[in-house]
């Protein structure tokens, strides 16, 4: 087995899952830290309106880029199954098709993001007080979306063959670069909100470049050869079969969250800043969720490729328990210390109030959020990507939008908007629980 590759079809399940998930968790921790420090620097040096402009970016970015990140997950599923079955030639064709497809879509995504950002911001009821700063931030950010999308495709390839360590190293490098540039641009040169986007895209291109260099020089079977990068129709069809549902799932969730954000925006820039600060804190609860869902997708994909059905079930159970437990532990911390965390971003009383209430509403439901994401990851690894897409579309999109429409007709209260998240997390968890335990998804 070449350096970096890890075949998870035999050996201790807990050890393999933890050692695969841990680098992802640490990498995501560094990424979350630099996102948090980014907002801390913006909030403390540029003020509440700049913080509102930057903090509201997450939902639009997820809507625009999340689709292709979902396709990257689908590519990882295909590659991991061929890797588990030791069909190296087919795996190689899938890898080079993935890279070719990523290059094409990332180019078009850059253009779409730049030209449609103002329209999206107006549609989200972004206050005029932060509109100019928001447009500036987004246009600069989407110039770097090429690096962001390609990084996710490269990481999908690495994780499919069991390599979660190198992405950790590269995230550490890019995180440090991002923080240093933030301080240099904003604190020293006194540049505006656009400089925060500049720092982010530079760091994204660095991490993507490091991943590409590794894939070009590795001695492993997942090595990329530039002359072999092309679209193989058979493998593109397979990648899209698994990736499109994941991509649509991300876009659907992103669309619903944009609707939620537009409702929050109607309460003014203090609400935007408070909820934006909270979103950075909530990101820490997503760390174990993201880490173990990635581990679960790879683990299930490899073991189904090797027809190790019993290991799939044991690994799925272990991953779910770890993710749910860790996420809820972080939720309790957020519930207890939420106001202090929010104050670190912006000490304005209204900002603290809006952010703290958001955290107190959601904190005890993170275990359900983790469960939904874990089952979704397991089903994607098993090639059942349509199921989580449908569940998320109904529970996290239709129910959220319909619920907001009904609540807004009855009362204009931000507390009601906050509750839409735990309610829909609960609905999706119930649905996934029934499907997971009543349907033979493993052999079907």
Predicted regions and their residues:
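Short runs within selected transmembrane alpha-helices of multi-pass transporters and secretion channels
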Residues: 72, 140-159, 167-175, 196-209, ...
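Small-residue-rich hydrophobic transmembrane alpha-helices
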Residues: 51-111, 148-167, 261, 274-338, ...
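Residue-level signal for short hydrophobic patches within transmembrane helices
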Residues: 10, 14-33, 37, 60-67, ...
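Transmembrane alpha-helix boundary and packing residues in multipass membrane permease domains
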Residues: 24, 28, 40, 44, ...
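Short alpha-helical transmembrane segments in multi-pass integral membrane proteins
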Residues: 1-21, 79-144, 188-244, 300-365, ...
């Amino acid at each position: 087995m070449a350096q970096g590759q890890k075949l998870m079809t035999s050996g201790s399940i807990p050890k393999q899952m933890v050692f695969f998930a841990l680098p992802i968790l640490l990498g995501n921790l560094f990424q979350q830290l630099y996102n948090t420090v980014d907002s801390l620097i913006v909030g403390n040096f540029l003020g509440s309106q700049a913080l509102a402009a930057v903090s509201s970016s997450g939902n639009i970015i997820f809507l625009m880029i999340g689709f292709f990140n979902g396709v990257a997950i689908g590519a990882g599923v295909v590659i991991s199954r061929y890797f588990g079955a030791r069909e190296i030639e087919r795996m190689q064709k899938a890898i080079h098709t993935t890279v070719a497809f990523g290059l094409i879509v990332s180019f078009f995504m850059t253009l779409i993001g730049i030209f449609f950002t103002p329209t999206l911001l107006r549609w989200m009821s972004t206050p005029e007080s932060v509109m100019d700063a928001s447009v500036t931030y987004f246009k600069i950010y989407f110039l770097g979306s090429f690096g962001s999308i390609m990084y996710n495709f490269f990481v999908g390839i690495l994780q499919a063959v069991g390599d979660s360590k190198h992405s950790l190293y590269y995230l550490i490098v890019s995180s440090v670069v991002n923080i240093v540039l933030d301080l240099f641009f904003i604190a020293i040169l006194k540049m505006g909100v656009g400089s925060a986007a500049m720092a982010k895209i530079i760091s994204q291109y660095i991490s993507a470049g490091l991943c590409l260099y590794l894939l070009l020089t590795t001695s492993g079977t997942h090595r990329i050869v530039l002359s072999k990068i092309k679209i193989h129709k058979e493998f593109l069809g397979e990648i899209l079969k698994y990736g499109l549902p994941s991509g649509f799932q991300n876009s659907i969730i992103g669309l619903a969250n944009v609707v939620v954000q537009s409702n929050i925006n109607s309460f003014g820039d203090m609400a935007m800043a408070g909820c934006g600060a909270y979103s950075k804190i909530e990101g820490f609860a997503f760390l174990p969720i993201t880490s173990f869902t990635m581990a679960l997708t790879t683990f299930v994909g490899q073991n189904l490729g090797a027809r190790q059905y019993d290991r799939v079930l044991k690994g799925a159970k272990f991953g779910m328990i770890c993710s749910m437990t860790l996420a809820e532990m972080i939720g309790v911390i957020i519930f207890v210390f939420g106001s202090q965390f929010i104050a670190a971003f912006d000490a304005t009383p209204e900002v603290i109030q809006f952010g703290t209430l958001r955290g107190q509403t959601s904190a005890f439901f993170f275990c359900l959020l983790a469960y939904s994401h874990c089952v979704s990851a397991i089903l994607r690894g098993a090639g059942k990507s349509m199921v989580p897409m449908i569940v998320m579309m109904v529970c996290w999109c239709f129910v959220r939008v319909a619920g907001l429409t009904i609540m807004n007709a009855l009362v204009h209260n931000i507390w009601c908007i906050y509750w839409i998240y735990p309610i829909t997390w609960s609905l999706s968890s119930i649905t996934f629980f029934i499907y997971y335990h009543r349907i033979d998804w493993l052999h079907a």
